[in-house]
Amino acid sequence: MIKSLLKSLLDDDEREVKKLRRTVEVINSLEAEFQELAEEEFPQKTGEFKERLKNGEELDDILPEAFALVREASQRVLGMRHFDVQLIGGMVLHQGRIAEMKTGEGKTLVATLPAYLNALEGKGVHIVTVNDYLAARDADWMGPVLEYCGLSVGLIVHGLSYEERKAAYACDVTYGTNNEMGFDYLRDNMVVSADNMVQRELHYAIIDEVDSILVDEARTPLIISGEGDKPTTLYYQIAKFIPRLRNEEDYKVDEKAHVVTLTEEGVKKVEKYFTIENLSENMELAHHVNQGLKAHSLMKRDRDYVIKDEQVIIVDEFTGRLMFGRRYSDGLHQAIEAKEGVKIEKESQTLATITFQNYFRMYHKLGGMTGTAKTEEEEFRKIYGMDVVSIPTHNPMIREDQADMVYRTEEGKFRAVVEDIISRHQAKQPVLVGTISVEKSEYLSAMLAKRGVKHQVLNAKYHEKEAQIIAQAGQEETVTIATNMAGRGTDIVLGEGIQELGGLYVLGTERHESRRIDNQLRGRSGRQGDPGESRFYVSLEDDLMRLFGSANVEGLMDRLGMDDDMPIEHKMISRAIESAQKKVEARNFSIRKNVLEYDDVINQQREVMYGERRKVLFGEDLKETVASMVDDVIEQAVERFAGEFKYSDEWDLPGFLSYIEQSIIPQPDFNQEDMRGMRKNEVVAFLAEKTQTLYEQREKEMGSEIMRELEKAILLRIIDEKWMDHIDAMDQLRNGISLRAYGQKDPLIEYKFEAFEAFQMMIESMKEDVVRYIFRVKVVQQPEERKTFENQGEEAEKKPVRVGKKIGRNDLCPCGSGKKYKKCCGRGVS
């Protein structure tokens, strides 16, 4: 009784799949009918489905016929017929859930089903993957199936012009990468003309490798930045000074928490070297020293980053790929550059930023697919509201997953790994060896070379050959050493006669801190019912065991008197490894959740700002908006100077008039005597009338058309400037807020409170600047006959078309035109 109850609780996936099989039967019953269709009838069917949706039918009503149509189109165009389990996967994606499908089960083909169905609504479908190669491959491969049914297919990859992007997003189905789509969203919120926006409303996205994008990349913000103006000399000074400090005595390293802290002795040395009295009062120096310590003691070359073409390039810890164009923030990247002696790039100023978590949560509906998601189901459910459904394989999975081999030392482990590889190599069985860093892959490669074993290395340094190396990895006598990248999205196909040798042997040289990454490595073998085998080798010196493992394991090995070359297989050790991984997974989830709680604050503010910006961008007549801002600024000025006094006689009238002249009405045609004896509301009415008269006068001088352009340009420019400064201020607030915990205050509540105050102040400051500019700028004719605006007040000349403070002249213009900044909005800007 209890067993059957437990089984029913555990088999949620089976129940879900069983339910969906009924719809599969309906789709299969339509197959013969759709096989009779002529080619020209496929687009006609699409038109018919769209009409039925307009007449009130739901997508679910059309689903069986839509899936049957796509299956038949795929059979004709590609010679590939969707299996029943692929139809189930397609339904799970359509429901806004995650389909966990093992490697080689045809996820790319599955995506065509929900993509076609949801594209019928005419609002666009995005199929998102992790890199340009996969996006282009999938669009070329699957696009013809959707086009056969009468849909348009677009592709978003790096390097496209603004026109190409706009056309791609206007298609029914758009393939692209998470990075490009996220950046396009940010760029759309920086353009100065509505025509330059490329994306439509975010309707439905299908994310391939969803765990990689929504979990591994969740903490990574997308940032558009301009060049900052902080000098770089301090980084060199600190890089020279750090080697004088001694670990434990001057600073302590906590690898688990990934932090370095100065001891009292260390603080004294810093103060002496930089000739300052109190380090705690010099926050900038303290921050830079801390980043320098991090760069020297926590960040390792060939593990966290590599040096390529005299540049520090980050290595993605989850995929092992080089992350070109990405930089560590907060001066850490500059600290690493100083440590390695390469050119230090200036710190940048953030113009716009968003995390993947918040970008993808803006879609009306989200579906995802991957080979490994079940271990992260709680996170998907809590953060994205998405369930994970395990889809059965088309053929039974017969790969043998062997127990871990545990060694006392890393050296002993690697000796055993080499012996295992040699014995498999002699038997001609292909071997895929997984390592967790560039450094470890090169160490193992040197050991194999010494023993004369021919092999290929696939790591961040050689990623250009990835597809070619992975394509060969299933051939006879092939040994491939790969970091975590191991070609996600590229199947390893077995060569002739390999099945008889036992299939591909996957050997993991270390357990990753996430069980999911280990499962991905195992999943390279045993695809589509092929035979295969996997085994992990572990040592007590591995990072996972050293930082999170149990001391009991080492005690057990001591008691058994085991030497370095003797492995141990014991349930207690397997449990200790799994327990260590669960600890790390829970910790990482907690960090991501905490990051999200903080990021949600700025995200809500971002949505408000971008919403207001779009109103300005699409607004034809902003006169009312500006007039309302003028009224607000007048009321605030009166409140500020009046205080509790009712009559103006009791105010500081000279100071009030001076403020009006500087911030609202330049060269007013009245004096303080004209306001004597007035109440607050009378002063407000008096000034409102004066500003209205001045506004009408300016409009008459300039003409209504130019005045409307002027309003839009000033509003956009000030919104962008204030938002950039606000992002910087919020970053600084967030970096310092953790110190509040020492004062027994909840840092998150404090952050929310102060962020709200900062946002309110930004809005007020924005209104003041708009009012100051609107009454002071005048149009001047430039030689190129471009309209710019000259400030009559104290401030320097301002050009509203310019979006960022320090965008490089050779950078692409953020307005989205696809031209260089100096040839576009930056023309004439020195």
Curated annotation (Swiss-Prot):
- Please give the catalytic activity noted in the UniProt record: ATP + H2O + cellular proteinSide 1 = ADP + phosphate + cellular proteinSide 2
Q: Name one GO cellular component term.
A: cell envelope Sec protein transport complex
EC assignment: the record states: 7.4.2.8
Q: Where does this protein reside within or beyond the cell?
A: Cell membrane; Cytoplasm
- Give the matching SUPFAM superfamilies: Helical scaffold and wing domains of SecA, P-loop containing nucleoside triphosphate hydrolases, Pre-protein crosslinking domain of SecA
> One GO molecular function term?
ATP binding
Q: Does the keyword Transmembrane helix apply?
A: no
One GO term (biological process): intracellular protein transmembrane transport
Q: Which cofactor does it need?
A: Zn(2+)
- Recite the UniProt keywords alphabetically: ATP-binding, Cell membrane, Cytoplasm, Membrane, Metal-binding, Nucleotide-binding, Protein transport, Translocase, Translocation, Transport, Zinc
How is this protein situated with respect to the membrane?
Peripheral membrane protein
Sites where the protein binds ATP:
86, 104-108, 491
Q: What does this protein do?
A: Part of the Sec protein translocase complex. Interacts with the SecYEG preprotein conducting channel. Has a central role in coupling the hydrolysis of ATP to the transfer of proteins into and across the cell membrane, serving as an ATP-driven molecular motor driving the stepwise translocation of polypeptide chains across the membrane.
- UniProt subunit comment: Monomer and homodimer. Part of the essential Sec protein translocation apparatus which comprises SecA, SecYEG and auxiliary proteins SecDF. Other proteins may also be involved.
This chain belongs to the protein called Protein translocase subunit SecA
Q: Please give the organism.
A: Syntrophomonas wolfei subsp. wolfei (strain DSM 2245B / Goettingen)
Q: Which gene encodes it?
A: secA
